[in-house]
Amino acid sequence: MALQVELVPTGEIIRVVHPHRPCKLALGSDGVRVTMESALTARDRVGVQDFVLLENFTSEAAFIENLRRRFRENLIYTYIGPVLVSVNPYRDLQIYSRQHMERYRGVSFYEVPPHLFAVADTVYRALRTERRDQAVMISGESGAGKTEATKRLLQFYAETCPAPERGGAVRDRLLQSNPVLEAFGNAKTLRNDNSSRFGKYMDVQFDFKGAPVGGHILSYLLEKSRVVHQNHGERNFHIFYQLLEGGEEETLRRLGLERNPQSYLYLVKGQCAKVSSINDKSDWKVVRKALTVIDFTEDEVEDLLSIVASVLHLGNIHFAANEESNAQVTTENQLKYLTRLLSVEGSTLREALTHRKIIAKGEELLSPLNLEQAAYARDALAKAVYSRTFTWLVGKINRSLASKDVESPSWRSTTVLGLLDIYGFEVFQHNSFEQFCINYCNEKLQQLFIELTLKSEQEEYEAEGIAWEPVQYFNNKIICDLVEEKFKGIISILDEECLRPGEATDLTFLEKLEDTVKHHPHFLTHKLADQRTRKSLGRGEFRLLHYAGEVTYSVTGFLDKNNDLLFRNLKETMCSSKNPIMSQCFDRSELSDKKRPETVATQFKMSLLQLVEILQSKEPAYVRCIKPNDAKQPGRFDEVLIRHQVKYLGLLENLRVRRAGFAYRRKYEAFLQRYKSLCPETWPTWAGRPQDGVAVLVRHLGYKPEEYKMGRTKIFIRFPKTLFATEDALEVRRQSLATKIQAAWRGFHWRQKFLRVKRSAICIQSWWRGTLGRRKAAKRKWAAQTIRRLIRGFVLRHAPRCPENAFFLDHVRTSFLLNLRRQLPQNVLDTSWPTPPPALREASELLRELCIKNMVWKYCRSISPEWKQQLQQKAVASEIFKGKKDNYPQSVPRLFISTRLGTDEISPRVLQALGSEPIQYAVPVVKYDRKGYKPRSRQLLLTPNAVVIVEDAKVKQRIDYANLTGISVSSLSDSLFVLHVQRADNKQKGDVVLQSDHVIETLTKTALSANRVNSININQGSITFAGGPGRDGTIDFTPGSELLITKAKNGHLAVVAPRLNSR
């Protein structure tokens, strides 16, 4: 068989060697550690993960040895059936990460190793699937890890539960309420560096989706005497040290505080201000951030810290006796700070601290206090201020956690998960009223545990007729009755002493106890003890034999602490406080209430009874915490201490009940309702009795006789694996049913949707057919009318406009315009135009002219300046030569060039001679002499003022435009032209005969430059020119086959030019 290995997030390797024999290997820091729960050798080393699997389950030694083995291997969790036993390791084991949470989420209880997260997930799934309120009860001695377990549970729910619709604010507040309550309610004791000095029960509300949507906290009996007194090696509440160590300098200056705790009387009595395991500075940052998360405003934080600082200043108030031995305040500076921080009148506070107000026969009298009484009043005020502030703080947190959607349907379907973190059983060298109340609370919780697990389970078996061998256990009801019994209990006797007239003292209370309960087996005093016991019992002490062991209590302070007396004038002073928190803590209605308030013990007893009712209304889960040693050292296993805790927690009795009993029981109706889908005969409904239906169901599931029993109203299943197998089958069945339901629903949904679409389609079709029919009829009617009007108009089309032909004429006009719009000319050369009807001829002509003008305007707007100049020159050429000179048509498609000679082709001497005159145009020409007509190469330059004829580097002739009288050219295709100058100009030798290959271009540019457009003469036959003073020359032009220029015999210049017939 192949070996399969699986590595899980905790570092364990699961080797599957047999389908029913899982084998685990865990990798530890000290090498490879094998934990094979099914192998004998591994079990000998790490023990079993469920005490139910112990072979010698009745042996206390075997039980403790199993704890030792697992503790040695850092396996701090072990089951007793569904009960989790946790041993405090006093160090971080790295087993609470997100990976661990995911490993335990949604997994059956016994499919994974024991863990607090397994209990958390089981409780959460029961809350969601069965819709029943749940409670996790965490119990154990002080320092056993109860508070840490509560925090881990909250962390698990915050990380793994779905987020509510309105975000994760509730989850954050649930988590952040812990550091705030710990700061104000926890302190270092001899046994625990973070001991809860109050009891806490938290309800977390979940909506139907399983998301946390709200919460509520109940607090019980804050140990307010710790504010003014601490035993040696203990500290006051954390908040005082955190504020001094972590507060900003400005904050401390405003509060009048200094960082040294030794400066405050209330912080030095335990002589333990600094603790290496506590970082007050970092804890302060956590608390400060948490206050913001739970909706504290900056003003509220400032008011709260003012109250905390006022308690420290109260402790530093000192008194001195005057001549009459009455107390007087001697620390004015502290009083000044108190007055400002508490926002009260200084004189009123001074008087309240040194006097007591007494009302006698309707009159108010002030009685001065001696030094002892003034110190008592000061400490009473400090305790009252702090304890009431703590109560206000819990209320503030509850308002922050309250669900905001109480009217929504999802809120009405919420379920509640309760977390109980109560102070553990305490036995100190000096035990007082607070330890008495705390241990009484633990007795009540132990009694509830017995009721819900041991006693109720055995009674249930008997009531259901299940064969059962009774398990003997110690029922601590006798101790609870000793404390709380009406008229005869310790609390009743204490209240009676506190309320009776006369001089009642702690010793008279002890004497009355001795008289009333002297025969009780769990009560002992010095007077009632034998000679040997009296050595360990003082005269002012009594001893109770609790379920957890013997505890000796000193009666000193019992009456004062139970009365919780605060002088009336101190109450009046605090009621006048302008501090918003103080004004809520001290209500003025207290002053007018004549009824004596209930004592502290009675209030605590009533609140415990209420707590027990709350827990009894929920489905409980148990975490039993064990402290391995008193020194808080990791790895140390104190067998004597652990044996004591195992005994008083009743773990062995719980194990024996679990081994002899059944793991699961449920009423027939509920069981059938949950699992009926697994059997075809019971699904979907069962018509007979529920008991018969369950019998059919378990037979179908294949339960063996030893796996279950049928009671009178319930079915009992012995083994968890049987229930897990049933749950697995149900999960598979649910998937199948869900698929069928989804298919049926989808079919129904889409069928309904199809029918709706079909009805809509029929309606739309009907409406559309009617609309089309009406449109068609209207169209036909309109067409008939239109045809009738057109025919009538056509008949009268030549008549003047009248109602009969107006429609036809308008139609004709419209048709013509629409047709014209489609057939408009595309350019100015396009002369096409649709033939208009007779009535539109005038309008058509106007439109044609507008169209042409528009096209011309668009064309002109689109051309560049260079092209515009080109067109202008071409237009001038056309005006001069079109139809008059044979070679003009050949020049039309050729663009005129700005110049035919570059500046590099013109001599620099010529340019220098011209000076600043720019050359507008230059072209090479041939000049003919005036006498012999000899041709000579020249350059013709046009400037803004003259025509310049250049020979190489010499200006031969300059003709100003003013002296240019005209230009002559023949009508043939030759390229000769004559520039005529004034005869009176002595500077000129006569007219100039020139020849240019670009004669049209040259003459056009010359005419434009000289402004002689109208001075160009196009001659036919001959041109006469001035050849010099008193002498004329003639040029004869005759058509021929080719161009020929010669001097004729008659002395004329004969030019033969071919006719191109292009004109």
From Swiss-Prot:
> Modified residue N6-methyllysine is at which positions?
383
InterPro entries named among the record's database cross-references: IQ_motif_EF-hand-BS, Kinesin_motor_dom_sf, Myosin_head_motor_dom-like, Myosin_TH1, MYSc_Myo1, P-loop_NTPase
> Where on this chain does ATP bind?
88, 96, 139-148, 192-196
Disulfide bridge map: none
What range(s) does the TH1 domain occupy? 885-1059
Q: How is it modified after translation?
A: Isoform 2 contains a N-acetylmethionine at position 1.
Molecular functions (GO terms): actin filament binding; ATP binding; calmodulin binding; microfilament motor activity; signaling receptor binding; small GTPase binding
| Region Actin-binding, residue ranges | 608-630
- Mind telling me which CDD domains this protein's record contains? IQCG, MYSc_Myo1
Give the modified residues of type N6-acetyllysine: 486
Q: Does the keyword ATP-binding apply?
A: yes
Cellular component per GO?
actin cytoskeleton; B-WICH complex; basal plasma membrane; brush border; cell cortex; cytoplasm; cytoplasmic vesicle membrane; cytosol
Known PANTHER family for this protein? MYOSIN, UNCONVENTIONAL MYOSIN-IC
Its job: Myosins are actin-based motor molecules with ATPase activity. Unconventional myosins serve in intracellular movements. Their highly divergent tails are presumed to bind to membranous compartments, which would be moved relative to actin filaments. Involved in glucose transporter recycling in response to insulin by regulating movement of intracellular GLUT4-containing vesicles to the plasma membrane. Component of the hair cell's (the sensory cells of the inner ear) adaptation-motor complex.
Q: Which family does it belong to?
A: Belongs to the TRAFAC class myosin-kinesin ATPase superfamily. Myosin family.
What is known about its subunit structure? Interacts (via its IQ motifs) with CABP1 and CIB1; the interaction with CABP1 and CIB1 is calcium-dependent. Interacts (via tail domain) with PLEKHB1 (via PH domain); the interaction is not affected by the presence or absence of calcium and CALM. Interacts with POLR1A. Interacts with POLR2A. Component of the B-WICH complex, at least composed of SMARCA5/SNF2H, BAZ1B/WSTF, SF3B1, DEK, MYO1C, ERCC6, MYBBP1A and DDX21. Interacts (via its IQ motifs) with CALM; this precludes interaction with YWHAB. Interacts with YWHAB; this precludes interaction with CALM. Interacts with RPS6.
Q: What is this protein called?
A: Unconventional myosin-Ic
Q: Which organism is it from?
A: Homo sapiens
